[in-house]
Amino acid sequence: MRLQDIDVTGFETLLLDRDGVVNRLRPDDYVKKWEEFEFLPGVLEILKAWNTHFKYIFIVTNQRGVGKEIMSEEDLKHIHERMISEVKNYGGRIDRIYYCTALTDSDINRKPGIGMFLQILRDYPDIDKAKCLMIGDSDSDIKFAKNCGIVGIKVI
């Protein structure tokens, strides 16, 4: 399914994976700096359209490149600041980005672990889990949604 084809009716909170959903994947590599970041076609348009639909829009992303010291956390924060700015300039929004830099899959914060979702619920206690939608491009993203007890949709 393509991002543009998803029916978001009835959902108030959107969780998006970053790499492969918002931006182009770098095969066997990481997006280490802004110059390597490339929005996928149609993403800016759909985020603009969804701006008024969703109460909250979050990014939840595993960023193992920081844990591997291929890039710094400051590099990651700079990429995210620029991404949020570009989305905002286009008329969309991202309310907050949650990321995990852990190397081990056993870390609760690393998807499919539920740590990032638990943090979202702590930070935004008015969120209704029944009205949350997770969109990702990997089996791990969909397993994350299932583990959180929310709807997950896989895009290709």
From Swiss-Prot:
UniProt keyword list: Capsule biogenesis/degradation, Carbohydrate metabolism, Cytoplasm, Hydrolase, Magnesium, Metal-binding
Cofactor: Mg(2+)
Main location: cytoplasm
Cellular location(s): Cytoplasm
Catalytic residue list: 17, 19
Enzyme Commission code(s) on record: 3.1.3.83
Site (Stabilizes the phosphoryl group): 61, 111
Chain sites annotated for binding substrate: 17-19, 61-64, 110-111
SUPFAM superfamilies on file: HAD-like (SSF56784)
Superkingdom, natural source: Bacteria
Protein's pathway: Nucleotide-sugar biosynthesis; GDP-D-glycero-alpha-D-manno-heptose biosynthesis; GDP-D-glycero-alpha-D-manno-heptose from D-glycero-alpha-D-manno-heptose 7-phosphate: step 2/3; Capsule biogenesis; capsule polysaccharide biosynthesis
Reactions accelerated catalytically: D-glycero-alpha-D-manno-heptose 1,7-bisphosphate + H2O = D-glycero-alpha-D-manno-heptose 1-phosphate + phosphate
An example Gene Ontology biological process: capsule polysaccharide biosynthetic process
Contributes to substrate recognition (site feature) positions: 110
Membrane-crossing residue ranges in chain numbering: none
Assembly description: Monomer.
Family statement drawn from the similarity comment of this UniProt entry: Belongs to the gmhB family.
Protein name as it appears in the record: D-glycero-alpha-D-manno-heptose-1,7-bisphosphate 7-phosphatase
Organism: Bacteroides thetaiotaomicron (strain ATCC 29148 / DSM 2079 / JCM 5827 / CCUG 10774 / NCTC 10582 / VPI-5482 / E50)
Gene name tied to this protein: gmhB
